[in-house]
């Protein structure tokens, strides 16, 4: 029983080790998968960052082009205003020169005044058009400032995305560190299990010593039984043929028991071989653990590589930040250009004031118009020149409008690209949320599995403790029954020389029933010892991982066949034991009925008759019992009644002991059936798992 327990413990330890190996493999697979997923996400993010960089570069180029075009337009406006100022100055000088000749040309001056009024109106129209163009340019500048704000927002969103990516990278680092800690914890657990395996080896040695002691005790019991059988044979040589047949049957049963014990020894040797095989498999498992450790080292190296890559990505992000700062500097330059535009506006206002002053001069000149009529023809030519210049200015304004339209188209394209970037960012955020939810669900499922396994482990531990307690109680009961049997044998030896033939026969019949009951108990216990060994071996063999699948399948099939054969043998032995018990009961009933029918003297042997004659010749109380007349004066009714009372007390004690033994046998039978059912349930569970 101790060997069975220790074998079960070894098997449970190996099963736990194998399950932990499988769990570690599954965890490594999951980690590799998660690392692959993280690498894929990192690659996707890298590609996305490259695309964003390309878009940023394109936007930069567009901004540079827009800045260049705006600068060119401003320079052209400045040139045009300078030309106009030069022309106005020239006109003023010409007007001053013409003042001297205006006196002579008063008649022509009136006509020229009318023409000048017309020219004034045209100039006012031109000023209005110029103001409108300035307003348009201011609106364009406002739109450019709005675009600048949008670009700032885009840069800020990109910076937020970079910070999120950095946080995700930090989370991945923390996950990798947690996985490394779990691997170390598993290694420590394996070391503890190795220490427990050493303790189990020491327990095996102790159990072998206990087995040798038990064998010696069994040999002594056999010798005592053989001595008893010899004494019975010497005293009952002239009994009936039925008793001889019973003795032969008992001898056959004893031989069968001897054979069963030899089979048990063979099973013990087989178990020792199986333990050696288990040691080999344990060594193989240790080699596999070493390989797993090497894999863990490789994973750590990969983790270091990933950390280096993350540092590189951080450097890239810092570079991008520097580029963003450069862009902000460029935006500041654009602000400076806006300030320059405002200055140009102020200059235009100053020019307007100068124009008003010129208008005042024109009003002064109107007084001198009378002398300016002579230059009508020249003024007409001047008007023609002004019309040509107006046409040129209109063509230039049309070109500026076309440039403005182009800039508006580029702005619309940039806005569409910004919207696409926003949509891609939203999609990425939704994907990240989905991945987080999936990982949370995986964690919850793993926690539920852990709780279920912990409950199963607790239930199995409670069952093991209950089985241990039941085995201890069975051992105690067996020890008490053996003690009772030894006491009864000693009492029978003592009473062989004192008790009469009738009482002798009754005691012999009771002893025969006891021996048969003890034989049935041994048979059942041997069957029970075999069944858990078989189940244990099957469980131990079924739980060997790390071997080729084909070898595992072949070995499982062989072990299942051997297990089925052993189960058939056990069932056959149980049926055979039941049949033997039924036959013994029938024979006991026949013997009891035969003894009740026949007289005590007919069943006695010739040796007992010679003993009776010898005692009757000697005289005394026993002689008066064996003869019809009193041979001793000391024998009285009181003495005879006391003797009868003592004999009745002995009979009552034997009957009570027989009843208790029957009850113990019944309880043992029920417990054995319960243990067999429990064993079958455990086998079914192991097969299902």
From Swiss-Prot:
Alphabetically ordered keywords of this record: Coiled coil, Phosphoprotein
Swiss-Prot/TrEMBL GO biological process terms: vesicle cytoskeletal trafficking
Modified residues annotated as Phosphoserine in this record: 531
Gene from which this protein is expressed: CCDC186
Biased composition (Low complexity): 509-525
Gene3D superfamilies in alphabetical order: 1.10.287.1490
Protein name (database record): Coiled-coil domain-containing protein 186
Coiled coil: 20-503, 550-594, 646-685
An MF annotation (GO) of this entry: small GTPase binding
């Amino acid at each position: 029983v101790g060997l069975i327990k220790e074998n079960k413990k070894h098997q449970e330890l190996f099963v736990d080790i194998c399950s932990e190996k499988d769990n570690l493999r599954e965890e490594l697979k999951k980690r590799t998968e998660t690392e692959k997923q993280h690498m894929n996400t990192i690659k996707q993010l890298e590609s996305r960052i490259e695309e964003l960089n390309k878009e940023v570069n394109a936007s930069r180029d567009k901004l540079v082009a827009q800045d260049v075009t705006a600068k060119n337009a401003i320079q052209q406006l400045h040139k045009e205003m300078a030309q106009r100022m030069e022309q106005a100055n020239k006109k003023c000088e010409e007007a001053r020169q013409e003042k001297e000749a205006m006196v002579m040309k008063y008649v022509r001056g009136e006509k020229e005044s009318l023409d000048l009024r017309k020219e004034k109106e045209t100039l006012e129209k031109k000023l209005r058009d110029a103001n409108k163009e300035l307003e348009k340019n201011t609106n364009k500048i406002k739109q450019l400032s709005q675009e600048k704000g949008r670009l700032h927002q885009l840069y800020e969103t990109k910076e937020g995305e970079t910070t999120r990516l950095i946080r995700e990278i930090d989370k991945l680092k923390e996950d990798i560190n947690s996985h490394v800690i779990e691997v170390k914890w598993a290694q420590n657990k394996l070391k503890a299990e190795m220490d427990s395996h050493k303790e189990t080896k020491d327990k095996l040695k102790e159990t072998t010593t206990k087995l040798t002691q038990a064998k010696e005790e069994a040999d002594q019991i056999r010798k005592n039984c053989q001595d008893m059988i010899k004494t019975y044979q010497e005293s009952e040589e002239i009994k009936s043929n039925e008793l001889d047949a019973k003795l032969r049957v008992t001898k056959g049963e004893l031989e069968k028991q001897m054979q069963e014990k030899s089979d048990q020894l063979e099973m013990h040797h087989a178990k020792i071989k199986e333990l050696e095989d288990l040691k080999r498999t344990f060594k193989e498992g240790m080699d596999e653990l070493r390989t797993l450790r090497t894999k863990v080292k490789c994973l750590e190296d990969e983790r270091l590589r990933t950390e280096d890559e993350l540092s590189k990505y951080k450097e890239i992000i810092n570079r991008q930040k520097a580029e963003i700062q450069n862009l902000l500097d460029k935006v500041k330059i654009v602000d400076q250009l806006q300030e320059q535009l405002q200055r140009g506006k102020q200059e235009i206002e100053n020019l307007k004031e100068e124009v008003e002053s010129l208008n005042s001069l024109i009003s002064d000149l109107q007084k001198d118009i009378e002398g300016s009529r002579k230059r009508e023809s020249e003024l007409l030519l001047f008007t023609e020149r002004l019309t040509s210049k107006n046409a040129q200015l209109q063509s230039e304004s049309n070109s500026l409008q076309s440039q403005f339209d182009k800039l508006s188209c580029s702005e619309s394209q940039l806005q569409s690209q910004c919207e696409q970037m926003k949509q891609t960012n939203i999609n990425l955020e939704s994907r990240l949320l989905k991945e987080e939810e999936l990982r949370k669900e995986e964690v919850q499922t793993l926690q539920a599995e852990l709780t279920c396994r912990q409950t199963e482990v607790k239930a199995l531990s409670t069952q093991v403790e209950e089985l241990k307690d039941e085995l201890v109680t069975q051992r105690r009961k067996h020890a008490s029954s053996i003690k009772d049997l030894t006491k009864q044998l000693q009492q029978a030896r003592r009473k062989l020389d004192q008790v009469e033939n009738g009482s002798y026969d009754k005691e012999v019949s009771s002893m025969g029933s006891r021996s048969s009951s003890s034989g049935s108990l041994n048979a059942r216990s041997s069957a029970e010892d075999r069944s858990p060994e078989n189940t244990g071996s099957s469980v131990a063999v079924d739980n060997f991982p790390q071997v080729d699948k084909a070898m595992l399948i072949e070995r499982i099939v062989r072990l299942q066949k051997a297990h089925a054969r052993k189960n058939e043998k056990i069932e056959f032995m149980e049926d055979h034991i039941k049949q033997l018990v039924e036959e013994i009961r029938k024979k006991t009933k026949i013997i009891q009925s035969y003894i009740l029918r026949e007289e005590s003297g007919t069943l006695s042997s010739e040796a007992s008759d010679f003993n009776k004659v010898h005692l009757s010749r000697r005289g005394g109380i026993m002689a008066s019992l064996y003869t019809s007349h009193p041979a001793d004066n000391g024998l009285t009714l009181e003495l005879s009644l006391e003797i009868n009372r003592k004999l009745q007390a002995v009979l009552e004690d034997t009957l009570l002991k027989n009843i208790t033994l029957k009850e113990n046998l019944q309880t043992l039978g029920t417990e054995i059936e319960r243990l067999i059912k429990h064993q079958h349930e455990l086998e079914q569970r192991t097969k299902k798992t």
